Amino acid sequence: MEQIISQVVKQLFDQDISVQLTRPDPKFGDFATNVALQLAKPLGKNPREIAEMIAENLRKEEDFSEVSVAGPGFINVKLSDQSVLNSLKKEPTTKRAGQTVVIETNCPNPFKAMHIGHALNAILADTMANLLAVDGAIVHRVSYHGDVGTHVGKSMWAILREIDGDVNKLNEIPTDKRNEFMSRMYVEGARAAKESPEAKAEIDELAKQSFVLDDPLYKQVYEICKSWSFDEIDSNVGRLGNVPIERRYVESETEELGKSLIKEKTPEVFTKSDGAYVFKGSKYGAFDNVFIGSHGNGLYGAHDMGLIQLKYKDYPNLDLSITVNGEEQAAYFRGVIAASELSIPALKGKLFNYATGLVKLTTGKMSSRTGEVVTIGWLFDEFKKAIENAGGEPTDDVIAGALRYQFLKVKIGGDVIFDINDAVSLTGNTGSYLQYAHARARGILAKSDKEIAFPTGLFDEDKMLVRKLSEYVDVVDRAKESLEPHHVCTYLFELAQEFNRYYEKNQVIGSDKEAHRVGIVAIYADILKAGLAILGIVAPNKI
């Protein structure tokens, strides 16, 4: 449609213009454009006059049943029934076809419990990867984990005290209790570091040991517990519905690479000051940050620059590299990206970080440093109880669907207000509601003995629903372009509501229009399923 309007503008005014379409109130039309207002200044004409000229030409198009002009020059277009039906056969565009995209997902650190904030970032990144794949990109899911440093020292301090020099005591911990054990160890270490100067000094030494691993007992315990952590992370993100990663990066393999590049790019990119290497990030919307300390150790910035090099080495045809992190790290990542692009010019414009908001509970912001966390294990247990209390069957697919949707329906960067009972409701804007809506539609189709066929025409009662169905491709294209899954969530919820209104007023099974209506129901069910798949949510046939 944009192309048709652009051609009319070119023919009438010899102007090349990018036509933007919006969805007005359905009573005004299916699409609206302000192209006449855009043309008013370059043409020196009244926008209403321009709009009338464009509208007159658009009325000749058989795809449009009605074209009107409103206000100062807005053009409203209503599609013909056949055009609406044809639009249901459209597929989303694939503007990123052939592009190579690397996206970090499933990235909690080992030696700590995976909590609800980790789940938000992992689910969002996984869904963005789905959108990129729908857009034609070759998507590589990878993960990055901090396996060295202070948090490791805290956990190892408590673990070594717990086993008292006997590594075999770790074998006595049941598999299903390992995550609880690791979480408890981290909390004990964090508390000790805060309360005891002596313990903090010991923890600092144990943190240093995580970089060198030259103590046999430490190394053995470290490797066992690190493996436990990764097993737990993989299990948890699998239960969340995430696609498995293809490459796991860890912080211990990045430092030397990062330090080497930073030193090579000094003073071109970095400044050396009192033995430290500093990036003047304040010039790039970030803050001045030390990447290598005066002690010679690489800090977070050096590690992240090493990671970027590893990804570029593993994926030399990289077109886009995406990370997803909390809003508190947004300025830091602006600095890392700026430093990386200056150091490796081939990556300019290819590195992006998306900042998420907070997950807000009644107890406030979570912190794994104090143990005030909602772990994934606890979260799944609570969802299971809530679904059972609501009369549902708490399968992993249903739990994951409710949880994912609760995160994804919020615009990226917005805070997620988390209420488990609301999240599993079958009557609100929830994943459970949409899964139920899909199962209900499949149930209707299962009751019909009519052959499912694509509608050949529309009755008046069909038009609101079918026009809503026709919006799907545009919504997905918008979500793909901005990498914002909430557009898909909003659309699917509105679509399910529209179908409910249709179904309440129009009998399907046993109606003299049954054959026609099951065709519409089938399209509705297929679109629901496709939209839920983008969100990483299973569309069950029964629930």
Q: What are these model-derived regions, one by one?
A:
Residues 10, 14-38, 42-543:
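NTP-dependent nucleotidyl-transfer catalytic core
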Residues 1-13:
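N-proximal, solvent-exposed amphipathic alpha-helical segments enriched in charged/polar residues
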